[in-house]
Amino acid sequence: MTSATALAGYVLVPATEAQDLVATERESVEWGQPLLTQDQFVTREKIVLGTTDFSVTRRQRWVLVPADDTTTLDFLSGCETYRRPILVKRPGKEQVERALSYSVCSVFVPESKRRNGYAAKMMTLLQHQLSPQVQVPKLLDEQEGDQVEGSGALVVQLDEGHEGEFKDGGKYGGNATCSFLYSDIDDYYSQFGWKVVGNRHVEWQPLSNGEKPAALPEGAKWLQPEELVELGRIDRQHLLSQLQNPATSNDAIRFCVDDPEATSWRWLIKRSNFYATTLLPESAPKPSYFGLLLPSSTGAEAESSYAVWMFDHVERKVAVLRLRFTSATAFAQLVGTVRQQAAEFGMKKCVAWNVDLASLGVELTKEDQDALEQGVRLERFQEALQGGALVERKGKSTSLPALAWYSDKQRGERIEWICNEYGWWC
């Protein structure tokens, strides 16, 4: 087996502070220009986002370097990972457990160093760093017939430690149950063990002139970013109930990201707000609210419905970070609000990933599935979807969720990602 630290004379190492800054400056050419100057891009990354609880406690920059010159500023490629707790429910186990995942982002090779295989070397070595087995894993569908025991993935009881930590000293890598990324280059990452999963979304147009959103119930609460922490706690309780639901499949390991303090949602909103203040005229109206909480008819917190969103001022869209509804009426109220917000602030569309179609009575036929796979926008469920069209994303610049699995499993068990929504994107 190839060494975890070396591959044909190259190593992947945690970046020094100087390497991290150079990597950020390099990325500004690809992801900052022409809207942001290099200084603005660095400010976004280092001052605005780099000081958030999401970045400070979870982020790691990696760089691919020659094995004999690990601190060089002329490194070959770079990427980032974020350490993310997850909740895991296994067949045959009564209790939900906690484990670790890593999200991968900012995979970048400078133009002058491309077409040399550096990205492939880096992603291979990154898998070696994250996986307890120190290897590139099989794809999800190829693992279904396998039995894995003693994987070395860190797993703790639900009540062990507080929600954000594992009492492991913050060990980074070599302890993951899974990792995931959002591919902008189709299924390129499948050769390194990341399988595209859950790449469908519902898309709506903003409300047009004369259209009004559904009336909100008494007690509906609009949420500012700092108020999302409480919603994160509510959402965690709902996700725990969803994982523990005995009516679900007994042949699937089910997991979701565990973020009860809403660090990811708040990070994404802070990122989008930077664009609002940087790109829009000072006199232009800026959004104040990024979530809506609808109380249940019984007043029970567990039965509430809610949506969290951000404004993408580059693509001019409202991205729904989290959408939870307990009825078709609540769905209509939440979607109407999001579409109204899009209209108010000049957005061109709204998107929500992996909406719970079954709860709305939407059942896809084989013909529907085939049409989606061929790139057809499915519009025949507009009544149930409140004017929305169902879309399957493919190709470049489409942020395709892709998952790699490292942990223990029994033969025949599938892996099911619960709540695979926009709110975990990075």
Stretches with model-predicted labels:
Residues 26-94, 243-298:
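Active-site rim helix/loop that mediates acceptor-substrate recognition in acyltransferases
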Residues 64, 81, 109, 309-311:
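GNAT/GCN5-related N-acetyltransferase fold signature
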Residues 87-103, 311-320:
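A conserved beta-turn-beta hairpin within the catalytic core of GNAT-like acetyltransferases
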Residues 106-109, 114-141, 328-343:
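Conserved acetyl-CoA-binding loop-helix of GNAT-fold acetyltransferases
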Residues 120-254:
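Contiguous mid-protein beta-loop-alpha structural module that forms a pocket-lining wall or clamp
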Residues 131-174, 285-302, 370-394:
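Intrinsically disordered, low-complexity domain-flanking/linker segments in eukaryotic proteins
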Residues 162-165, 172, 182, 186-217, ...:
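Active-site/acyl-donor-binding loops of N-acyltransferases
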Residues 195-321:
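Amide-forming acyltransferase catalytic core, primarily the GNAT-like/NAT-type
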